[in-house]
Structures are given as structure tokens and as C-alpha cells.
Amino acid sequence: LMIAEELNKICNDVGINLIFKSSFDKANRSSINSDRGIKLDDALKIFEKIKTNFNLPILTDVHNEDQCNQLNQDSIIDIIQIPAFLCRQTDLLLAAGNTNKIINVKKGQFLSPTDVKNIFTKIETTNNKNIMITERGTSFGYNTLVNDFKGLDIMKRYEYPVIFDATHSVQQPGGLGDKSGGQREHIPSLCKAAISIGVA
């Protein structure tokens, strides 16, 4: 709640629309000893308070079909996010699509820009065309991600909103052994490059 309040204040001050994003379960942590989060039921209670207090649209990740089915029953979550590692999981994409909510798919680090067409096609079979795709870097050897900015142009051709995730683009997966590292000093430059191309 404190984070939502502060972000809401900052965005109101500068005139930016805010979508509040929070993961209730970080299911793909590097180490079994890392904190993961809370149960979806508990998270929904917190999300409801955020929506009531600040009137913000809310985005959260899902990791299985049961979570999609549970979110299908509520009006709290506005946008369902598919994690990058799960972006090709057909049953998960279909379950998310069947909620008729907005779906944001994180493009897998292993996918080419043209591969996202298959993601769109899967979700479209549910008659849900409220889809967004997020670029978050491409694997480049071990523990390193890079950005090919031609990919943003290519993905825009499919006429769905393209988002650029600068923070995950500078991630170094597993770079610290039992957790990921990162190079945050490059975030401003990558954001400028993405803005120059034009993203959602």
C-alpha cells in the first residue's frame, strides 16, 4: 500500500498514467532459499485495498491455469501477465485469454521478434484480442541479456501494443550465483532508445 501511494503521488505530479504491477509469487527464483511471496487469496485482499484507495488498474503475474480461473471470478485484477519463461505454454495462454481480461505477455529471452505471432494467435483463438507484448531482453551467452531494437519495430507490425521493460533488460540471470544481478546504470539509455522507436 505504501508503494502504491508513493507511485500514485509521483505519477499524479508529473501527469503520467499508472498501472500498478505487483507479483504475489515469484515462482522462478534462482534459489530455493529466496523469498517467493504470498498466496493469491491474500494478494487479492491487498490489491482490492489498492484499487479502492487509489483507483488504479492492477497487473499481476500468473503461473498456472488455476490462477487464471480464480482471477476470472474477480474484478480486482485488470491485466494478467504471462512470465517470459512461460510465454509458449499453450494451456496457460488459453486460460488467460478465456478470462477476457487484458493479457500482457513477457517475450521470452529465447524468442525471436517474429515468434510472438504464435503467442498472439493462441490467445486470439479465445476471442480475446486485448493483448500486449513486452520486450525484456534476449539471452546472449551465459548470464547476459541484450536488446535488438529492430525487434520492437518488427513486433509493432502485429498491431498490438509493444512495451519495453528496461529493468529486466539489464538483468544478469543467475549472475550472482544463487540470484540474479543487473546493470542498472544502463536503464536510462535503453529507455531513450525504446522511446525513440515508439512503444506503448
Question: Model-predicted segments: where are they?
Answer:
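Glycine-rich, proline-tolerant flexible connector loops at the mouths of alpha/beta enzymes
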Residues: 1, 18-40
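N-terminal glycine-rich anion-binding loops that anchor highly charged ligand groups
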Residues: 11-23, 200
